[in-house]
């Protein structure tokens, strides 16, 4: 449906929007982002089940409610400290969402409780005469509001059923979550990451998850480097039977989230498989919100391998903490 959007930092514009919609001040707006990796700047946790929803329905008509790290602006944050985020698929919304220095807060272009507009002509006159700009993109392709899902409880709950129906959400969430670690040759860093993640996650067997690794320039069926095997053995992990695996379209398609070690890996995957751009993260980007790389220890000393393993383990612990949404929560619509 057609929407209204403002820069959430512009208090005058925000107040004008609320007045035009006759919208209660305690009802926040929805944050639009042009890509999912930007959510790290706004949320405390990205629960495991939300990864499946994000990979399946973003960009698209799904709004996800997260616990936020923000205290303000009031127009985006609920009294309970939650925020609604969506990555839209429409090119106009995508372009505006990607503008620098704008926090794009949105809502439907209607008076509160009234039907939403499917064309520019259906936008109420009292809204049309007050807004600064109307972008007429013709009739909306879907004509229905986004589905809203709260993932802040142990089991996600549907707050509003829209384009994406509850049965489809339920079916999606029944599938296991697939995590893929990627480096260059799949003989060092991604091997370490896969093994370390599995070890740390081992006590959470009630949640269906599959972890794999691959390399952007890997050859098939090569063993890890001797130093990789040694430093993993020092951690009680045996990776000697691991065989290197090239990155393939099938691996990318089945993954719900892809962690890369370097920006070149991220760009490589995005360029060859553009459909996957919303599920590719630098490992440190997801864990800590930093666009920093984990360098390749190949050709360096055994101690460099130990340093790399420690670095990866530190980030993996943060990842597990971030996706482990296990907490007390009431039975929900998807429960």
Pin down the residues of each PLM region.
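Local beta-strand N-terminus motif with an aromatic residue
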Residues: 131, 255-256
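Phosphate-binding/catalytic loops
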Residues: 76-77, 104, 109-114, 152-157, ...
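Active-site-adjacent structural elements in enzyme catalytic cores
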Residues: 1-182, 333
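Conserved beta-strand segments of alpha/beta enzyme cores
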Residues: 103, 133, 210-212, 238, ...
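Conserved active-site segments centered on acidic
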Residues: 176-254, 321-325
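Short helix-capping segments at alpha-helix termini
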Residues: 24, 201-208, 273-276
């Amino acid at each position: 449906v057609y929407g209204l959007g403002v820069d959430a930092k512009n208090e005058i514009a925000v107040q004008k929007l609320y007045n035009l919609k006759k919208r209660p001040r305690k009802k926040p707006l929805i944050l639009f982002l042009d890509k999912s990796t930007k959510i790290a700047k706004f949320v405390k946790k990205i629960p495991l089940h939300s990864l499946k929803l994000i990979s399946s329905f973003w960009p698209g008509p799904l709004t996800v409610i997260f616990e936020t790290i923000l205290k303000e602006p009031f127009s985006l944050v609920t009294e309970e400290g939650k925020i609604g985020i969506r990555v839209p698929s429409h090119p106009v919304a995508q372009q505006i969402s990607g503008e620098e220095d704008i926090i794009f807060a949105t809502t439907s272009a209607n008076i509160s409780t009234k039907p939403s507009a499917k064309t520019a002509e259906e936008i109420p006159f009292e809204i049309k005469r007050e807004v600064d700009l109307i972008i007429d993109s013709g009739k909306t392709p879907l004509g229905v509001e986004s589905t809203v899902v709260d993932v802040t409880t142990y089991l996600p709950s549907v707050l509003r059923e829209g384009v994406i129906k509850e049965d489809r959400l339920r079916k999606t969430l029944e599938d296991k979550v697939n995590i893929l670690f990627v480096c260059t040759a799949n003989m060092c860093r991604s091997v370490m990451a896969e093994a370390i993640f599995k070890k740390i996650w081992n006590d959470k067997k009630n949640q269906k998850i599959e972890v794999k690794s691959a390399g952007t320039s890997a050859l098939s069926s090569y063993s890890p480097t001797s130093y990789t095997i040694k430093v993993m053995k020092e951690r009680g992990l045996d990776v000697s039977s691991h065989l290197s695996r090239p990155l393939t379209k099938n691996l990318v398609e089945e993954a719900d989230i892809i962690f890369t070690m370097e920006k070149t890996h991220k760009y490589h995957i995005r360029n060859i498989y553009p459909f996957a751009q919303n599920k590719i993260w630098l490992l440190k980007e997801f864990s800590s919100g930093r666009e920093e790389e984990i360098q390749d220890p190949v050709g360096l000393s055994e101690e460099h391998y130990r340093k790399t393993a420690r670095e990866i383990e530190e980030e993996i612990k943060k990842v597990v903490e971030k996706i482990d949404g296990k907490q007390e929560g009431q039975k929900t619509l998807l429960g």
